[in-house]
Amino acid sequence: MLDIHHGDNLDVLARLGDASFDLIYIDPPFNTGRAQTRTSWKATRVAKGGRVAFNGARYTQVRTGSSSFSDVFDDYLGFLGPRLVEARRLLTPTGSLFVHLDFREVHYAKVMLDQLFGRSSFINEIIWAYDYGGRTNKRWSPKHDNILWYARDPRHFTFNVGATDRVPYLAPGLAGAEKAARGKVPTDTWWHTIVSPTGKEKTGYPTQKPLGILERIVRVHSNPGDRLLDFFAGSGSFGDAADRNGRDCVLVDSSRTAIAVMKRRFKGRPVQLHTTESRSTRSRREK
């Protein structure tokens, strides 16, 4: 079951019970200092003009829409901190929190998480590496994201390593034929392409993360029937990964665009939709 909540995540989190989630993953805004925008395109066959495909057919691209959100914060940690406090409260004794960021804020967030959870509760930093997009000649081009893993209790947490997908050896000739055919358990560096702008997985939502990354987290760090949470849900990819693997998931986002994307994405699946009035709106109405 997927529960989708439309509202400020801090208001929604306050209504959820203590120790009620086995796994929490969040992909908050990265504080890039600019608007994040994704434009959707559809290829349409034409008789003349346009571009020529491999089979000789001609097509043109038609813009079908776009979505965007502001990614600018004057006090980023002041925004994120109260939500991380709530996340810790919501974790079960064997639960884990995954915080997906990039180079801009990850180091500051880690210091705050160390203070909140305790340094011993920091288990791993996972590097998601990809090779796509623009480059710069002014510095080394950043081509990775950082995912911080914290356990509610560093002595007891779910880690089903046997449930993970296996990846190819970088030097299969050195591993031997049998090992090369079987592949290896991933390390803390995960090479995975971004969501293709023209692939079936795309939703048109900015900053959408690939299912391959999220399904690995779901399978290894939770069990079938567990309850999961993503309170920066965006396009709903974490909920999709949870649902595909037999987990219940609560998804929260304040963006109408995100809610619309998730409603389209999960059409035909068992979904409950809730709207939570913000505290500021409620206080204005009650005056």
What are these model-derived regions, one by one?
Residues 1-270:
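Core catalytic lobe of class I
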Residues 2-3, 265-287:
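SAM-dependent methyltransferase catalytic region
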